[in-house]
């Protein structure tokens, strides 16, 4: 059994950003046109009038101020409100592969590794571009990595589940090092005409190098002390888009073919589950919550993160204890907690302990205990 470390992280950020004000302007233009087009039916009570949104509402509900996106114009067009992403030929690298390459190159550089040092690729994300061939095998080919690759989807927890899979492979000697990447085009499955959720998601890609400790040489190493995962079935976060939709044409275009959630139920049910999993994980490793210097939590909602930290610590978290990146990135699904790790790790002293945690649809929750080398 080999000791395992994270030796490098990377981040790909799209060039385009949308502020709350821009998003609200587009949404309200759609609402005004809808209400005007349906004025007679609304007056008769046959159609419910839509309600405008505001930047203040979005920030109060989520803590989000802006988000990065792969396409801005298509989202902000009130007549479209969907990103415009052109199809590519089968001979071109796909857009998820392109994002993964950008994040992977930074992770490899921070780890001091090349493609020749990597034996496997795991693409772990919520929104895979296609059923097959696996996006991971495409990334593997694009980077010139020998070995194997596969895709996995555990929604917003995909990164922590991917980290456990990568850790197991390296521990058991099945690979010297694994590249785990999380390319997320969340805006592709978001209903920008839904007032309660149109502001939630952004796009990004993260990458992590997991390797044998005795082969690691970078200045950015974290021992992977332990991993713990849990799932519990729930319909409160769901997306029913899939290849079987064409076999049931009556459902094509229905709202459940995009992201839908029961937000209040998710908040009420998931927060205590996350706090309990992390607390039990620490106890199993003879650690106290007070031993943890940093919590890199899934970046879905500021109020959720504040509550989880409060449940764990018994008080409000200090600014550096549970860093927030969702104000500028929004919810990037599986990439969020890794963005927090990537941007808030270099200041930690040797020996400092941290917890990387994700939570989302499934329900699925992951906890990874890390120790700075």
Model-derived features with residue positions:
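Condensing-enzyme catalytic core mediating Claisen C-C bond formation in acyl metabolism
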Residues: 1-93, 194-268, 276, 372-373
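Conserved beta-ketoacyl condensing-enzyme motif
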Residues: 6, 50, 54-154, 282-305
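Short beta-strand segments
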Residues: 7, 124, 153, 178-184, ...
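Short acidic, glycine/serine/threonine-rich loops at helix termini
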Residues: 17-18, 132-135, 163-164, 189-195, ...
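Claisen-condensing/thiolase-fold acyl-transfer catalytic domains that form or cleave C-C bonds
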Residues: 97, 101, 108, 127-128, ...
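Flexible, glycine-rich active-site loops centered on histidine and acidic residues
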Residues: 174-205
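Acyl-CoA/ACP chain-elongation machinery
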Residues: 182-183, 190, 232-239, 301-302, ...
